[in-house]
Amino acid sequence: MDNKSIEEYLGFGSGAVDGLGIGGLLKVRVEDFRVEEVSSIPALDPKGRFTVVRVTLVNWETNRFLKRLSRACGINRNRVFASGLKDKRAITTQLLVIDASQKKIEQVDIADSTIEILGRTHQKIGMSDHDGNRFTLTVRGCCDVDGAPLEGKEAMRRVLDLIEKMSEKLGENIFPNWIGPQRFGSTRPVTPEVGRAVVSGDFEEAVNLYLGMKGLNDGKETDELREMWRVTHDPAKCL
């Protein structure tokens, strides 16, 4: 199974509607991908224990930034609360709640980041507390199927045509939630198979699939281990 057949296996071989695409590349530059978290600011109170901030990050992996921020504030990483992880190669904006004084946070200076203090609160935030994310994408190098460059106006015309067709087929302002192969396993799409077995209550099959399914880039040792599991289902023989 190669990369193309994996995409077809996962159902990525066709579009939601028929129409001409625009080709092109995403994330050529960091500023080509922008993510703005849509969330409500926790109730503010000057006597609150926590500080609420809005951070804008440029090319930062979220967890790495949170660790860097906690060190700068002199606190444990577990005292910095976020609602979600954002793309690294992007400009991202999101809320954080920090268990540190406003004065301490005002002194923080981390490269490629902006920290806007919103106030104090008694409330923490947890994963997925936000309402959603707003994405702004720049597509560069748009081209036709034969590789011929597309003018910006023609590319936009095609995009608007596809949006109109999707509105007719799916409903107004409804857009398919496209999920790339990486969510399923880009070189070993085992996740949907294991999930199907778990949902069916066949946990033994879920384990067999997880351990035994071949991967596109498995090394010799891993490939032999998976084959041994498929043949014997014996952990001792696989070690």
Segments (PLM) and residue ranges:
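Extended, charged/glycine-rich binding lobes that contact polyanionic ligands
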Residues: 1-44, 50, 58-59, 72-73, ...
